[in-house]
Amino acid sequence: MRCIVLAAGMGVRMNSKYAKVTHTVCGKPMIRWILDTVLNLLDKVCVVVGHDADSVKKLLPENVEVVHQSQQLGTGHAVMSARNFIDPADNLLILYGDMPLITEGTIQKIINSHNLSNCDATVVSVEMNDPTGYGRIVRDKSGKFVKIVEESEASNREKAIVEVNTGVYIFNGRKLLEVLPMINCKNKKGEYYLTDVFAFLERVNIYKSERSCEFIGINNRIQLAQAEKFRRQWILEELMIKGVTIVDPETTYIDADVKIGRDSIIYPMSFIHGDTKIGEDCIIGPMTRIIDSYIGDRVTIVRSECKGARIMSDVSVGPFSRLREGTVLCNGVKIGNFVEIKNSEIDQNTKAQHLTYLGDAVVGKSVNIGAGTITCNFDGKRKNQTVIEDEVFIGSNTALVAPVKVEKGAFVAAGSTINRNVPAWSLAIARARQEIKLNWVIDKRKKEED
């Protein structure tokens, strides 16, 4: 069996400059949801592109064929554009690219139903409480297929039908090639409707699915949000079945490609996106955002943001920390409140607990970074590196003016501005000497009174 995915539409009701199928559901473009599902079952897949074709093509895997529909003149015209892909000796599955919820199991059931029916085509239908916008399935008194009528062409009686066409079909390839030239665009929209081919087919099977949620088509941002909610629920349920605790699924947002180990706990208002992997026995949240990051085992991240970071095991982050791209935290590191780290590697058992900025830094093992420490990494033209070797103690309110190195075991006194390298096991003090003027306040007040 072959498959054509229709992805040429502009999606006017999305009110977007981007092709409809490029919009994401749980971090994955709609077109990739449908293709990843289909390619698990079939290896011959063609995608029909049109509006914003280049953007759509960038999202397609290499093992699919691409056909360009130069004018968007309806679903029938889209299939005509791909007629060279249709094999008369093979069946053809047709799907829309804006159906990100359809599952592999449902597609397999549709295929099985068609194979058992010995019919020219199979139409997939569902019942909807509100069928507005969908073509209606018209049956005869015995329940057999009569026709599909598009809503714009339907009578009031036909509009009252709640069994709708999902836009998913299987055709006998030879039959479809025979009847495609018979359809025309003599209708209110001036389009070639693929549904018109059924008037020329004698044997049509109907597969009525009980899972209407899988066939939600995305035509506007409201439906996009509805699809996101369904898919998010399925993602969270799968994680919970695999041993992850989701404290409040209603306020937890996890993308499709995220991996989380068992016995980890995800607290409310956590947003975990992109290519993120979280190990076992972790505590994430509440109010935490993680993007494209690796997190080892037994890591705690509270009220913080991580993007493009690598965090090894037994690390504590937060609250109110920000880990930016290029951050690496090795085993046992502790990052506390209001700490920002960018493009820096922090070695084992080092602590930066309060009010710190580390940018473009290499920090060794068992280092203590005092509150208020900053690396002055930008000189106005380029970023410079700060190196802090093992067992260094950096006192509070220290400014490290890069490029600079603090060698092993050195101490930097609180309040210092360090702009020269500090030798190993040395004490660096770079601040003005304190001066005390006894009774200065009393003398000042006396002068003011005179």
From Swiss-Prot:
Its EC number is 2.7.7.23, 2.3.1.157. The active site is at 354 (proton acceptor). Residues 243-450 are annotated as: N-acetyltransferase. One of its GO terms (cellular component) is membrane. Residues 222-242 are annotated as: Linker. Residues 1-221 are annotated as: Pyrophosphorylase. Its cofactor is Mg(2+). CDD domains: GT2_GlmU_N_bac (cd02540), LbH_GlmU_C (cd03353). Keywords: Acyltransferase, Cell shape, Cell wall biogenesis/degradation, Cytoplasm, Magnesium, Metal-binding, Multifunctional enzyme, Nucleotidyltransferase, Peptidoglycan synthesis, Repeat, Transferase. Catalyzes the last two sequential reactions in the de novo biosynthetic pathway for UDP-N-acetylglucosamine (UDP-GlcNAc). The C-terminal domain catalyzes the transfer of acetyl group from acetyl coenzyme A to glucosamine-1-phosphate (GlcN-1-P) to produce N-acetylglucosamine-1-phosphate (GlcNAc-1-P), which is converted into UDP-GlcNAc by the transfer of uridine 5-monophosphate (from uridine 5-triphosphate), a reaction catalyzed by the N-terminal domain. Homotrimer. This is Bifunctional protein GlmU. It comes from Pseudothermotoga lettingae (strain ATCC BAA-301 / DSM 14385 / NBRC 107922 / TMO). The lineage of its organism: Bacteria, Thermotogati, Thermotogota, Thermotogae, Thermotogales.
